[in-house]
Structures are given as structure tokens and as C-alpha cells.
Amino acid sequence: EVMQRFKPTLTVIYLSNVDGCHSNFTNYLGSLHRADHGVGHIWDYIQNNIPQMANNTTMMVIPEHGRNLVSNNIEDGNAFSGYDHSDANSRRIFSSIVGPGIDGNLSIGNENNQVGDIVNLTPTIAEILGCKDDVVNSGLVASSKSLFDLI
């Protein structure tokens, strides 16, 4: 209803605790399945029910951060080690982007050939919104390159 009424230029959907897997791997897989289904449902809803947004919307699915490469020395009740968010590896994330002008068959980067970094997300969002130059020229972002610049 909110999307139909307001047809937002930018919508952020936070998928809380999707990555929690320490106590029950089956629940973790269920969380991933629900998140995947929810994202697909939102995309399909936009494309099929909101003509003003259909074929005029870009959706990005990205985590808020990665994890350190090496665990810390804190273990939970199931003897799983904890991971912080402080080394360069914590900036490595996946992203999935769909929308107009984006090749649906394009797949770039992998664990051994990384493309982009979490610092490229703000310029990417700004580019989609049409204000990248203003954002980059503000001096408040760590990178001037969007993911589109890197592909």
C-alpha cells in the first residue's frame, strides 16, 4: 500500500538478522529463504502492480558489511567463534542489482577477482538517483567510483 501510494524514489528494506546462524543452521537457511522470497515478492509486486515504477526501478540487495577474515577469540554457547567487522575483509560484500539498463545475465567478480567494495555503494546509489556528482563533490564519501564505473 505504501509503495502504491507514494511511489518512492528510494526505499531501504532492512532484512534483520538474516545472517544469524550460530545456534541453528536450519533456521539460518529458513531466514535466507524468507529474505529471498520477500525480495522477489517486492520486485514482482512493483513490476506487476505499480506501472509508474515498473521498468523504472532499480533494486539492490546488499549486506551492511562483511566479516573479518580471521575470527576473534570469543566463542558462543555452541563453540562457534565470533567475527568482528574491522579488517579490510569486512568491506568485501556481495551485491545483486536489477533494473533498467542492467544486463540481467551479467555476473562479475568472485572471491578471487573482486570488483568493488562497500565504499562504492554510496556513489552507486547516488548515481541511480542522479546526484552522484553532488555526493562525490561533497567530500564526505570514501570513493568517487560507483559499481557502474567498475564494470
Each predicted region: which residue ranges?
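Active-site His/acidic residue clusters
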Residues: E1-H41, Y45, E75
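Membrane-interface soluble catalytic domains
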Residues: L29-G30, D36, G40, D44-N55, ...
